[in-house]
Each structure stands twice: as C-alpha cells, then as structure tokens.
Amino acid sequence: MKKVILLDIDGVLVHHGGYRAALHATLNHFASLMGLDHFDFPEEKLAELEKRGIFSEWDMVPLLLATLWNDILAHRPNLSLPSDLSSAAVELGRNLNGYMPRELIIPEFEYIAGQYPAEAALKHGCFSSIPMDLRVNILSQSRNINLSQTMRLFQHYSLGSRVFSETYELPAEVETESFLLTHDRSYITDAIRARLRQPNIYLAGLTARPSAPPREVDDSHLGYAPEAEVALKLVGLADIPLIAFGKLEYLAAQRGLDAGALIKPSPVHALAATVAALTGNEWAGLQAAGDWFQTGKLNGAFADLPREFELFVVEDTLGGVRSTLTAGEILRQSGFDVLTHTIGLTSGSVSKIESFTQAGIPYFDNWELLIAGIGL
C-alpha cells in the first residue's frame, strides 16, 4: 500500500537553531535599546508556548516583548510612551531605575479562528498596561513586513541583511549574517533519508516556514522568503513537494482568502500536502485543497489519487497532527480508504513529551527510534 508521509521541518527535519537564535537576537536588539545586557527566555518556556499552539517566532517575539513591557509599565503606570517600538524601548530604558521582573508569564487568551496568536492576544485585551497605540504596533500585522517592526527585524536575522533586502526590496536596518545558514543542522542521516525514500513512500513538507510560491508557477518571488526550501536543501530533500506558508499565501492571494485560515491546524494544509506528495504537483494540491475550503467538496486533483493509502505525519507539535487527523477524516468521508498515523518527535523535550502524552499521540525521541517504531 502506498504511504504518504508529511514532514514538519523545524524540530523534525532540522534543529531549528536559526529561528531560535533570530528570536533571541531580535529580543536582545530591543533590550540593547533599553540599556540592558540581554533579554532571554529559556527554551523550555518557548516550548511551553508551542504546547499552547503558539508555534511561530513571528508571534513569539511580539508576545514576549509585550510581556516584558507590560510588566515594567505595571510598575510605572504613569509613563507616557511613543507608538514606535524602537523609540518606546529607549524611553522605557530611561525609566527602569533598576527594576527588572524576575518571572515573566505570558497571559492565557482564547484563540480566534483564522487569526494569528499575537493579534488574538490584542483582541482579547491582554497587556493592558501598554498604551493602546503602542500595543497595536507590537501585536498587530505580525506577518506584514512593512508594518510589523518585530517581524521585519526578525527577518533580518533569519535571512541575513543581503537576502532580506533582495527578498523584500527594503533597505537593511541592521547588518547581520543569516542565522538559518549558521545555526540550523539536520536531524536526519543518510541512512534515515534512504529509509524515507523507499518505493511506495511519497513525501511532502508540511511547515509554517516562509517559502517561495508553488514551484509550478512563474510569478514574482518578491516578498516570499525561501526559508523552507533552505531547510529541505540542508537535509538533502530539496526535490520533495513542499506546502509551506509562502505557498498558502500565494493561494490566498489568488482567491482573496486569509492565509492564516489555511495553515495548520487547518486541514487545508495537510490536504494540499497529501495531494502534492502523491502527484508531485504543489499547485495542484493547493488548488484542490482551496476548492475544498471554499466548497466543502473534494474535486480536482483528488480524483486522480489512489483510493487507498496510509497517511503519516511526523510532527514536534500538535498543529500538523490536528491538520492531518482532520484531513484524514475528510478523505474518509469522501470515500477514500485512508489509515492515518500521527507520530510525534520530541528530541527529549519534556514539554513536547507531555503534550503528546496528553493528546494520546505516540512519540519517539529521535529518528532512529521512530523509523524502527513505525516499521519503515
């Protein structure tokens, strides 16, 4: 029987040291403006955010920054701040008077369907000690390179200054190398890659990383950062189909949709990746999944799929797990005989182990155990 295996990238194919380093560099940029030596959250704290469904550093950075500033302003309630983040950081630094919080806790808030976590926190009224204009500038438009100062700075560190300017046609605001190139490393060996490339196994990337548009289209790549493609090249899987954030953004732009409603845990993400894996065509997968999103029917490329196959997903968080479980159910309701397997990869992380245990998802600490455990 054919096996489709959907592969997350960060925490599954690569150790995402680049994104974590870019996160810390972005936070420390603002810390420096405040006159502080550093501002860091330990990895387990960041893993707890992922456990809550906050997977992207584009959300983590504004939420962490807002948490720090809200705590400071709760102890400086009458401090007036400009709405520009850099200017606000300088002004906050002038008024610290030696105060620094010992423990920072990001508030709980309800997620809003189709909305990114940072913006959901804003809608929920979190960080009320921060003046509204500044709060909006921190938390809103978290994927807009022109409007989000945190995203724009983070992308400098992820891509490097030169590629940042080439990708977005914007002048570099800081000079830096690409942390993706200097800090990411592969989790898979040649032996693991060979097991994944066996006959009757069909692979596709399933990631929230930015990416180029679908490889079958010939439109401009302006604003599309090829970060997912960089990772697949690093692990020796550059040729497999990929459904990443940039691909979903492209589909959303073509159809007047919100990309946030298409990305995992939305089943659109896994449906598109499943079609792409079996057909080798990213754009066909995206269009077919987009049709389901808009009509509730599996049309187009789904007609060309085998009626029976196994659907695996390997994830380090629950977003892709939920996307794939729902996609499998949609396929079965449409007459496909699909057996769904959700596999967690923890790399020994306590919070990831707890998350998968609570969700009843089988998990493994490393790829060697995973390959043996699922019988590949």
Regions found by a protein language model. Give the residues of each.
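Active-site neighborhood of HAD-like aspartate-dependent phosphohydrolases
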Residues: 1-46, 52-55, 59-62, 66-70, ...
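Asp-based, Mg2+/Mn2+-dependent phosphohydrolase catalytic module
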Residues: 1-3, 217-376
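Non-catalytic pre-domain segments flanking phosphatase-related domains
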Residues: 1-7, 32, 62, 66-152, ...
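Short, surface-exposed acidic
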Residues: 32-49, 70-84, 237-240, 282-289
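Phosphate/oxyanion-binding active-site loops and adjacent basic polyanion-contact surfaces
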Residues: 15-19, 23, 53-57, 180-185, ...
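Pocket-edge positions in alpha/beta enzyme catalytic cores
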Residues: 46-49, 53, 261-262, 362
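Surface-exposed alpha-helical segments enriched in charged/polar residues
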Residues: 28, 66, 190-197, 275, ...
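Substrate-recognition element of Asp-dependent hydrolases with the DxDx(T/V) motif
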Residues: 5, 12-13, 97-105, 109-251
